[in-house]
A protein has these predicted regions:
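Active-site and ligand/interface coordination hotspots across diverse enzymes
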Residues: 1-57
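A generic structural signal for short, non-catalytic loop/turn and secondary-structure boundary residues
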Residues: 24-26, 71, 144-145
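Glycine-rich anion/phosphate-binding loops
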Residues: 54-62, 95-102
């Protein structure tokens, strides 16, 4: 896993450290990372990289900064596919079981927290199979529970 994930990490902005990490231990995948709030910015990115409990990465810090600019009181990041890789082309083979758990974690959070809109922060269209499959499945789930996705 180490060779797939950047060593370039950063501190979280003070007061914006995560209090929700699934799974809590650092491993080759991550379903959720964020700081709970009553009005959080919820972003769905491509796939996770290096961010963990004590160290952030560029993408996470950008999302935190957007949440601050929008006066949100929290931030939560999910991904189209949960495998850690700074370069998505280095991910392993698609695993439907991992994807099913990913969808389950996203849906559970959105429903339990009455989230009605998310930021689709997954970047440009990718030709990477697991991201294509992940995007289709995530968008289908969001539609089924009435959550709007904003992306550009």
């Amino acid at each position: 896993m180490q060779e797939k994930v950047t060593k370039n990490t950063f501190l979280y902005p003070k007061g914006y450290e995560p209090d929700c990490i699934i799974p809590s231990e650092y491993c080759s995948f991550r379903f959720a990372l964020g700081k709970q709030g009553q009005n959080p910015l919820v972003a769905i990115c491509m796939n996770p990289s290096a961010a963990r409990e004590t160290l952030s990465d560029r993408t996470i810090n950008r999302i935190i900064n957007v949440s601050k600019e929008l006066c949100m009181d929290g931030w939560m990041v999910f991904n189209l596919y949960p495998e850690r890789a700074t370069d998505a082309t280095k991910m392993d083979v698609f695993q439907q079981e991992l994807m099913d758990r990913n969808i389950q974690e996203i849906e559970k959070y959105l429903v339990e927290n009455n989230i009605k809109e998310v930021w689709g922060a997954w970047g440009n269209d990718s030709n990477i199979d697991m991201l294509i499959k992940g995007k289709e499945q995530v968008k289908d789930m969001l539609s089924s529970i009435g959550v709007k996705v904003y992306y550009f």
